[in-house]
Amino acid sequence: MDQLMAMRAFTRVVESGSFTRAADSLNMPIATLSKLVKSLEAHLETRLLHRTTRRVVTTAEGMEYYEKVLRVLIDIEDIDTAFRASCCTPKGHLRIDVGGSTARDVLIPLLPDFFQRYPDLRISLGVADRPVDLISGNVDCVIRGGPLDDSSLIARHIGDARMIACATPGYLKTHGIPAYPQELRNGHKLISYLSPVTGRAFPFRFLEQGEPLEISVPHHLGVNESNAHLAAALAGLGIIQTFGYAARAHLKTGALVEILSDWRPKAYPFHVVYPQSRHLTHRLRVFIAWLAEVFPAAVKG
């Protein structure tokens, strides 16, 4: 038995909750992975996992073993990284998840610089506004805006985006330009961004004399994807509140006009996030370091 590989197979099953997903993430047949875990249990003379037709449950002994093995694997990864980083260019495959407008307007335009620096790295980019499960979703990290509330994740702040309210000149000519946020309640057509998770509309947020102000009214149109949300505004359907970087090009051409600029809310924080349990490989380290260098100016908008 290759004990190190068996340990890696076991930890991946625990993290993903599935033999199939674990095998896929390790690029090995499920039969091979299952044999490794069974050999590990036989070697330890301990049942680590309970298997049913629907799910895999970690035993108490299995969880204790997982926590100890994880530290060993992280130490091994750190040792390898320390020696490789000084003499080798990073190689391999990164799986990154990012929201739609952030991918289109910030990350993808920056990627030529990344690939010029690290030509031996490959990236699979998952683009969706709906958050992924970092443990079972088989991704190395995600780039997300907004507050973080999961203590099991490690987050690095990589910039702040300004939020703006805007509409087309045609819409504003027909409906008038609101002079202050409360006027949005007076007959204006609002295009709300809907949470991809809950379906609820996010309120329009502003600052009034330094204090947060939220405007929540029934929306004319609700959209749960950031690129479609912007497209609705460009179609003249109403007023949106969006990231400055998403509207930047359209503000320059005059296709959109910012309104209520004196009431802009606080900047929206962005983070790159990964699980505490995920081994921080050399390739992920260089990607995060690169993000920290180039992302803040691009996301600011």
Which positions does each model-derived feature cover?
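Alpha-helical residues within the helix-turn-helix
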Residues: 24, 42, 116
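Short helix-loop hinge/linker segments at domain boundaries
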Residues: 53-56, 63, 74-97
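Central regulatory/effector-binding core of bacterial HTH transcription factors
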Residues: 91-154
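C-terminal regulatory
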Residues: 132-136, 148-270, 297-301
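Residues within the DNA-recognition helix of helix-turn-helix
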Residues: 29, 35-39, 110
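Short alpha-helical elements of helix-turn-helix
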Residues: 1-16, 34, 63-66, 70-73
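A short LG(V/I)-centered, amphipathic sequence patch enriched
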Residues: 41-60, 256
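Short helix-boundary/capping micro-motifs
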Residues: 12-27
